[in-house]
């Protein structure tokens, strides 16, 4: 999975049961990856080298950004999916577990995309290969209001802090 944000290409990979990683790559004005030749890394040819990277939890399927927050979708099999919002971190390429806010979704979430204040969510539960084993079949792209999601989260936190 990958996304483009703030002049950089972010790339991640899916893993089932072990931590995965995301990496950030520089892109020039024409949209090409910026290649580097670093003899200290044993390179005798130019290639794209990540500006930075971070480990993320397993089963990530999609990635996007909203208001300088990193959003990752996580899913595998028939277990509930989740979208996790991470605040920007100076230490770990956005992935600060202490700042994570998680939203639960039906199983088999895949790609996520932000346009303005809207989050678009796509599932694979209606695909032929998975529909017979899926409890909740979502056969369309969902459009969700990110300000409403954040407002809901603030209300939940406010109610919890009262106790």
Predicted regions, residues:
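Recurrent small/Gly-Pro-centered beta-turn motifs in extracellular repeat architectures
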Residues: 12-15, 73-75, 122-125
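Short coil/turn segments that connect the beta-strands within blades of beta-propeller domains
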Residues: 6-8, 67-70, 116-118
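Structural motif
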Residues: 17-28, 78-88, 127-155
């Amino acid at each position: 999975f990958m996304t483009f944000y703030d002049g950089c290409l972010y790339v991640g990979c899916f893993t089932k049961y072990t931590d995965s990683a995301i990496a950030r790559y520089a892109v020039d004005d024409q949209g090409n990856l910026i290649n580097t030749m670093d003899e200290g890394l044993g390179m005798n040819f130019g290639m794209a080298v990540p500006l930075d990277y971070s480990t993320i939890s397993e089963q990530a399927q999609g990635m996007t950004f909203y208001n300088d927050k990193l959003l990752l979708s996580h899913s595998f099999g028939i277990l509930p999916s989740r979208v996790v919002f991470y605040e920007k971190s100076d230490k770990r390429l956005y992935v600060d577990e202490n700042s994570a806010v998680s939203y639960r979704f039906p199983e088999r979430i895949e790609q996520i995309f932000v346009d303005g204040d809207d989050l678009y969510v796509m599932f694979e539960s209606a695909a032929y290969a998975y529909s017979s084993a899926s409890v909740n079949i979502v056969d369309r792209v969902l459009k969700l209001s990110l300000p409403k999601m954040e407002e809901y989260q603030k209300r939940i936190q406010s109610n919890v802090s009262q106790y």
